[in-house]
Swiss-Prot record:
Similarity annotation: Belongs to the ATPase A chain family.
Disulfide bond annotation, renumbered to this chain: none
Protein name, UniProt field: ATP synthase subunit a
PROSITE patterns in UniProt: ATPASE_A (PS00449)
Main location: membrane
Keywords per UniProt: ATP synthesis, Cell inner membrane, Cell membrane, CF(0), Hydrogen ion transport, Ion transport, Membrane, Transmembrane, Transmembrane helix, Transport
Amino acid sequence: MAGTTAEYISHHLSFLASGDGFWAVHLDTLFFSLLAGVIFLFVFSRVAKNATSGVPGKLQCFVEIVIGWVDGLVKDNFHGPRNVIAPLALTIFCWVFIMNAIDLVPVDFLPQLANMFGIHYLRAVPTADISATLGMSICVFFLILFYTVKSKGFGGLVKEYTLHPFNHWVFIPVNFILETVTLLAKPISLAFRLFGNMYAGELIFILIAVMYMADNFALQALGIPLHLVWAIFHILVITLQAFIFMMLTIVYLSIAYNKADH
C-alpha cells in the first residue's frame, strides 16, 4: 500500500487496466459490473422461481414492490408498449443501484483483499469510471434512435433533424446542428451526471479514510462519525442516482417514441 497521503489517494484512484491510453481496458470495472449484473439476475431469478400465490416471503414482497413501482413509472411516462421498456427500466435501476452500492464497502477492504492475490490496483465502483457510464449512455443513445425510427420511420427521423424547429429548407443546416446537439447532450449528460456524483462520493470516502492515517488522535477519532454520516447520506445518493438514470432513460425513450404526435 502507498505511504504518503498523495500516494494513498493516487493508489485508490488507479484502475486495474490492460493496455495504455484510450484503448486501456479497465478490468476491475468489467469484473464488478458483471458481478453486479449476476447479483441482480440471481436475486430476481430466485424470487421468480420460488414465487408463491400464497403468503409471500419478505424478499418476494420487496421485489414485487420494486417491480410494481418501476412498472407504474413506465406506465405514467411511456405511452406505448411496455413489454420492453419496463424490464429495461427495472434492469437499469437495479443494476446501477448495485454498482453504486459497492461504494459503501470500506475503501481499503477490497484493494487489500486484491493485494493478497497480487493485484496491486483495484477500483471497485464501476459507476465511478466514465468509460462504464458512457457505455451505458451510448446504449441509451442507440435506443433513442431506434424508437424514433420505429415511431416515425427513417424518413421521419431525417425530417425531424432537418425541418425542426424551423420548418423551411433554408434552415436545414441550423436545424440539423440544433437537433444533433440536443440529441448528443442526452447520453453525455446521463453519463457525466452519474459518473460525477459517484466519483465525488468515492473521493470523499478516500479523504475520510486519510484522516485515519493522521498523527493527531483527535483527527483520527473525527473520521469515525464523519464516515458514518457520509455513508448514511450516500445511501440516498446511490439510490437517487440510479433512479435519475432510469427515469431519464424512460423520458428520453418516451420522447423518441411519441415524436410522431408532436
